[in-house]
Amino acid sequence: VRIMPHREKGEGHFAAEFVKEEETGKINIGCPQSADKETEKIYRAFERENLNVRLDGRFVSFGENLYLAPQNVPDLRGIKCLRPGIFLGEIRKGRLVPAHHLCMCLKAEDFKRTASLTEDELCAYRRGESVFRACENGFGAALYGGRYPVGWFKSSGGQLKNHYPKYLRG
């Protein structure tokens, strides 16, 4: 391939040739921080109570944070990894507090509890305020336009307690 700099648009060009020195064989998919069975049970209990979908993959934990990585994730030892998969939530006092990332990767029909918010309720929700609405107790998704998840709420006694991340409020 010939690239003539005076004929192509762009600020520069880069070309590289990679040479495979040896056959690597099978990839070691062992993950040193795989979550223990108890952590997986806590997540599955949350899933049964609050979601209509079952997520499959490899559960990975970094401290109290639980992630769902693809099944074929390679060995992460020695690699700085921002997020090895979907951030499911944080394990606190033997239960899962769901992460905003989990809510954003699901569809409206994947939640057992939903609340379609009006424009005014959505503005209040995004400011961090609670919304008053009758709903079964537990975690659910606040929806925009009845279809698009905006974030989590926890329903208790007719009040949808806001679980919208503080760093997104405004």
Report residues per predicted region.
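Core SAM-dependent methyltransferase catalytic element
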Residues: 1-30
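Polybasic, low-complexity RNA-engagement segments
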Residues: 21-170
